[in-house]
UniProtKB/Swiss-Prot annotation:
Gene3D superfamilies: 2.30.30.790. It comes from Prosthecochloris aestuarii (strain DSM 271 / SK 413). The keyword Ribonucleoprotein applies. It comes from the Bacteria. InterPro entries: Ribosomal_bL19 (IPR001857), Ribosomal_bL19_CS (IPR018257), Ribosomal_bL19_sf (IPR038657), Translation_prot_SH3-like_sf (IPR008991). Pfam families: Ribosomal_L19 (PF01245). PROSITE patterns: RIBOSOMAL_L19 (PS01015). This is Large ribosomal subunit protein bL19. Belongs to the bacterial ribosomal protein bL19 family. GO terms for molecular function: structural constituent of ribosome.
């Protein structure tokens, strides 16, 4: 039974997502349905948490909007995610960046930048 679940989940898992970690600054395009209309909404922030695995994987993204911290928990396997673009790769020593919640202003989104080498094929 367990193998059957793994096979079904592997078939359903999204393959078009970039490799992301806590500390990375990302910009997401989310599909929002309002009544009969459908539009894309941009959401940019820092990943402060990553939990689950496979089809159950979720990330918590935090941004500062008009001086107020806003967090969204987003399932990565959601069909409402149009695209994810990594703006900045963050270098952290922790898996959960909950200490960013106490910070205000620019410091609330400041994480050291990680150097990423370009793939050999490009």
């Amino acid at each position: 039974m367990d193998q059957l679940i793994q096979v079904v989940e592997a078939a359903q898992e999204r393959q078009d997502l970039p490799e992301i970690r806590p500390g990375d600054t990302i910009k997401m395009q989310l599909r929002v349905i309002e009544g009969e209309k459908e539009r894309l909404q941009a959401y940019e922030g820092v990943i402060i948490s990553d939990s689950g695995a496979g089809t159950n994987r979720t990330i918590t993204v935090r941004k500062i909007s008009n001086g107020v911290g806003v967090e969204r928990i987003i399932p990565l396997n959601s069909p409402n995610i149009e695209s994810i673009e990594v703006r900045k790769y963050g270098k952290t020593r922790r898996a959960k960046l909950s200490y960013l919640r106490k910070r205000t202003g620019k410091a609330a989104l400041r994480v050291k930048e990680r150097k990423v080498s370009a793939p050999a094929g490009k």
